[in-house]
Amino acid sequence: MWTIMIGSKNRAKVHALQEVVIRDKIIVRSEAVPSDVASQPFSDQETIQGAINRANHCLSFDGVDYGVGLEGGVVRSEYGLFLCNWGALVSQTGDQWVAGGARVPLPQEVAHELEGGKELGDIMESLTKNPDVRMTDGAIGYLTDGEISRKAMFQHVVHLLIGQARRDGHLLRTVTH
């Protein structure tokens, strides 16, 4: 049995991991750990680094076999600002896997506020009038009119991470699905 720690107490992120590994003999723990990047990552590189940093911080806790970091950010393109999300899975043996997920263009008014220094989560709270939006639908829920939740978006990334690890002989299933 393995223990995986996710470097966040955010319910959307924690539940994303729990629901992906629920049928496996894996213990999921969560702790708030720093990303060591800006509170609003503004590139793929910074968002990836935040996810890797969170995952690595998890390995410093006793009894943790694998660490997971999930990080949301924004990225500039010739088509405007896009929402991005990245994840990292690291093992105590030094292995590391990285995966990214959905990209959705941000409305011009949201991009303008981001460029002015606001955090996406704060902007979404204001737009949705939901102080809990980071734990529920997130920006992706707003941008897709509820078709995709933040949890579902991060579940996709977790599936990509776990799948890569299993391909490499880690976290092999111990129960039949």
Curated annotation (Swiss-Prot):
An MF annotation (GO) of this entry: nucleotide binding
Domain of life of the organism encoding this protein: Bacteria
UniProt keyword list: Hydrolase, Magnesium, Manganese, Metal-binding, Nucleotide metabolism, Nucleotide-binding
EC primary class: hydrolase
InterPro entries: ITPase-like_fam (IPR029001), Non_canon_purine_NTPase (IPR002786), NTPase/PRRC1 (IPR026533), YjjX_NTPase (IPR050299)
Enzyme Commission (EC) number: 3.6.1.73
Biological process according to GO: nucleotide metabolic process
Pfam family, one: NTPase_I-T
Catalytic reaction(s) noted: XTP + H2O = XDP + phosphate + H(+); ITP + H2O = IDP + phosphate + H(+)
Family: Belongs to the YjjX NTPase family.
Subunit architecture: Homodimer.
Protein function: Phosphatase that hydrolyzes non-canonical purine nucleotides such as XTP and ITP to their respective diphosphate derivatives. Probably excludes non-canonical purines from DNA/RNA precursor pool, thus preventing their incorporation into DNA/RNA and avoiding chromosomal lesions.
Stated name of the protein: Probable inosine/xanthosine triphosphatase
Lineage: Bacteria, Bacillati, Bacillota, Bacilli, Bacillales
